[in-house]
Structures are given as structure tokens and as C-alpha cells.
């Protein structure tokens, strides 16, 4: 069975107000109404999840969150639990994004010299979150990717493979088959410098082979692997045409309904072409 392309918008800390998030969703919904052969999700800030979820109810667009803690409840100031996300209607949750791991694509002086310790997610904490999400029927979007120094040192495959092996420890092949993995080279995120499509495809293929070795052929064939990192309406078609890339995790371009819908339509067109082929 062919994998259904999956386009997800990671809005990050945008827009600042819930009513602005509602406006963005209202602009997006008619642009993708009736679209086929592709799944779409948006991941707004936590403060807008309820408002956006109400608007999406009954639509073809699903709701996702940008992160979560692994405990269901307790004395964890500032955290959001998987139960809370399920309660507001989330289907997806992004886990292990490089910005949560403290790995940024470009310097941000506002973060100061300790930027790498702002959030500090590790493979171990991502794994705890992953298993908690699965317990509560949330579909994880697990992000992996290398920094520029790691790429220049020829360590891309080791870094990405290691993140997959450690992050997915203790889960079953059936669970892996139903989740989403996202290759996001850290040096491409928010920089306007996307990974070249053939290289993105190569690394996504590496991810699939890593899954095959760890979880078997069926899981590797079923798991969807997105590319993320400066995906735009200009480069989406080339990226999404690659055989190992099953969708995109879109940052800045997802904040513009016209640009985001263009990416979604590109995925739909490619899926229809592949089906005909």
C-alpha cells in the first residue's frame, strides 16, 4: 500500500494571539477543501490549540501540538501533558525538534551564550515523550537531524542513525509503522537554505534502512518520513518528488495560507501522478 503524503505546519511561537491563529486557519481551510491523496495538519502554539481545534472540527485538516511532557499530570510547572493534548483534540505531536533539543540553525543573540541549554531535549527525553504519546493514542512526529559542524565532519549518517535508534528504543514495529519521522537538518531550519533534494532523499533513505534493521521490513515500508528545513512553495515539488520523502514539516511557509496551500497541492499532484504511474 502506498504511503499517504503528510504535510504538517509547525507554527512555532506564531502568531502571538489566538484570534490571529483563527484567521490563519480560516484562510487556509477553503484553499485545501476537497484536496485528495494527502493528509494535512497544523501545529499552532499551545495557547491557540483549543480555538484552532474548534475551527478544524469536521474539516480535513487535523490538529497537532509542538511538544509535550511525558507525565500525565503532576508538579511540572509550565509543562503540557499528553492527556491535555488529547483533551483538546490533538492527533499529532512534534517531538525532538532541533529547537527543543537546543540545536539552532542560525545564531540568535537574544538567547545568549547558553542557547544550547534553553530546552535541552535529549534522545532519552524524546524517547520518554514518544512512549507517553503512544500510550495516549497521539501520533508522534519525531524529528532528527545533524548540525552544520556534524555534516562538515562527515557525521550526518551516524548522528541521524543514532537519534533514530535511541529515540525509538522500546517501541514495537507496529507502533513505528504508524508514526511519522521528520528529517530536519539543523543547518537548514529557519535559514532559507534547504537541503538539496537528492541529499534529503538519501538521508531519508538512510532513516528507512535504519528502521528496517531495527524494526523489520513492514515497519520500514509503512512509516512516513517527512523532510523539514526551509521548505517553501518554490522547492516543495522537487523535494516531495523524491521517492523516500513522504511529506514535509513546514515552518515559516505554513504561516502564509497561500504558500502553505501551494505546498499541500504540490503533494497532492505528485501523489496522483504516482498513482497513475
Please identify what each model-predicted range represents.
Residues 1-277:
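Active-site loop-to-helix "anion-binding N-cap" substructures in soluble metabolic enzymes
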Amino acid at each position: 500500500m502506498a504511503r499517504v503524503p503528510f504535510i504538517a505546519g509547525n507554527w512555532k511561537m506564531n502568531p502571538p494571539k489566538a484570534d490571529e491563529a483563527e484567521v490563519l486557519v480560516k484562510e487556509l481551510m477553503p484553499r485545501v477543501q476537497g484536496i485528495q491523496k494527502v493528509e494535512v495538519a497544523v501545529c499552532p502554539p499551545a495557547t491557540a490549540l483549543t480555538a484552532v481545534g474548534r475551527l478544524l472540527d469536521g474539516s480535513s485538516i487535523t490538529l497537532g501540538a509542538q511538544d509535550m511532557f511525558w507525565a500525565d499530570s503532576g508538579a511540572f510547572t509550565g509543562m503540557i501533558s499528553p492527556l491535555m493534548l488529547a483533551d483538546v483534540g490533538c492527533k499529532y505531536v512534534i517531538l525532538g525538534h532541533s529547537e527543543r533539543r537546543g540545536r539552532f540553525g542560525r545564531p540568535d543573540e537574544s538567547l545568549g551564550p547558553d542557547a544550547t541549554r534553553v530546552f535541552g531535549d535529549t534522545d532519552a527525553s524524546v524517547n520518554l515523550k514518544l512512549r507517553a504519546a503512544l500510550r495516549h493514542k497521539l501520533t508522534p512526529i519525531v524529528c532528527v537531524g545533524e548540525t552544520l559542524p556534524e555534516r562538515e565532519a562527515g557525521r550526518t549518517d551516524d548522528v541521524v542513525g543514532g537519534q533514530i535508534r535511541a529515540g525509538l528504543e522500546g517501541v514495537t514495529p507496529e507502533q513505528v509503522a504508524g508514526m511519522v519521522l521528520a528529517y530536519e537538518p539543523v543547518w537548514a531550519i529557519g535559514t532559507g537554505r534547504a537541503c538539496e533534494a537528492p541529499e534529503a532523499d538519501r538521508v531519508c533513505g538512510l532513516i528507512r534502512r535504519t528502521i528496517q534493521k531495527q524494526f523489520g521490513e513492514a515497519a520500514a515500508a509503512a512509516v512516513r518520513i517527512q523532510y523539514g528545513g526551509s521548505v517553501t512553495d518554490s522547492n516543495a515539488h522537487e523535494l516531495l518528488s523524491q521517492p523516500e520523502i513522504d511529506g514535509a514539516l513546514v515552518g515559516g511557509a505554513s504561516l502564509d495560507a497561500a504558500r502553505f496551500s501551494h505546498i499541500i497541492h504540490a503533494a497532492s499532484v505528485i501523489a496522483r501522478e504516482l498513482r497513475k504511474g
